[in-house]
């Protein structure tokens, strides 16, 4: 399954473009722009599993840095600052990674 099976390709393109500048990433705005906020809980979980590149059941910090590439292969990597900010917002239990429920909460709070 690809991201465009779940989200509109044009919405993804616009959202990735909106955050092309380093240190401009805002996960709340991004999730709204790609249409993730409006998706069902099941679809949000499917997006999580696409972003979980190593299929560990978690999005670890190294995967988080490439989150935009999970939506669009030609997107930029997040800066270290952006990655840490996103991890802090999503990692509710402090284990250094984001699980599917934490990701769902992160999207819902957007």
UniProtKB/Swiss-Prot annotation:
Record-listed Ca(2+) 2 binding positions: 91, 93, 95, 97, 102
Residue list for modification Phosphoserine: 2, 24
Gene3D superfamilies assigned to the protein according to its UniProt record, in alphabetical order: EF-hand
Record InterPro entries: EF-hand-dom_pair (IPR011992), EF_Hand_1_Ca_BS (IPR018247), EF_hand_dom (IPR002048), Parvalbumin (IPR008080)
Record-level GO cellular component terms: cytoplasm
Domain EF-hand: 39-74, 78-110
Residue sites binding Ca(2+) 1 per the record: 52, 54, 56, 58, 60, 63
PROSITE patterns: EF_HAND_1 (PS00018), EF_HAND_2 (PS50222)
Keywords: Acetylation, Calcium, Metal-binding, Muscle protein, Phosphoprotein, Repeat
One GO MF term: calcium ion binding
Residues found modified as N-acetylserine: 2
Physiological role: In muscle, parvalbumin is thought to be involved in relaxation after contraction. It binds two calcium ions.
Entry comment, domain topic: AB domain, comprising of helices A and B, is involved in structural stabilization, protecting the hydrophobic core of the protein. It is required for high-affinity binding of Ca(2+) and for Mg(2+)-binding.
Family: Belongs to the parvalbumin family.
Name of the protein this chain belongs to: Parvalbumin alpha
Source organism per UniProt: Macaca fuscata fuscata
Gene: PVALB
